[in-house]
Amino acid sequence: HPLTIPLAVALGCDTFDSASYVLYAKHDRYMEEDRTSRLADIRYFSCTCEVCTKFSPKEILSLESEEKIGKIALHNLFAIKAEVDRVKESIHQGRLWEYVMKKMRAHPKLFEAVDIFTKNSNYFVNTTPKFKKRSIFLFSKEDQYRPEILAFKNTVQKFKTRKKIAVLTKNTTIRPAYLTNEYSILKEKFKDSESIQFCFYN
């Protein structure tokens, strides 16, 4: 089902093989982004696939059994493909964690899987980029277990310096900070800049 694809990808699955689009269609089950509905319970299609733009739910229900199954199956296949594309785009945008958390909130039983991510998020640290072009979004307590946050937490805990003064300042527009003019200008404001530990935040 489309709902399970983001979770599977986040857990490392990269190949899918499913006959669900046909099996669901045989029982008039219509796949949606966050649920599965009986076709008889739907009045309007929000999907824009070639089936849903040409037929209404009532029209599909009136078709002969074989043709009806074919139409629903084609839509279901589109729904699965669309979800795969949304997951791929969320990875490209660096938003897979946010997308997975959003999808898990579509159903209470599915949200029970959140424990898998929060209790085992250390496994994701090594495969998650520490630096991203976009800021990360923090919505709830579960987000404190994001791999990026755990990675920085581990870095801070292991970091040691003999310098007794720390200066916290806003992150530079270009990274790494120590190669920028902003950093050079900042250092010039202190008489003994080599004895100071400069820390940048965003």
Predicted regions, residues:
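C-terminal extensions of enzymes
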Residues: C49, T53-N202
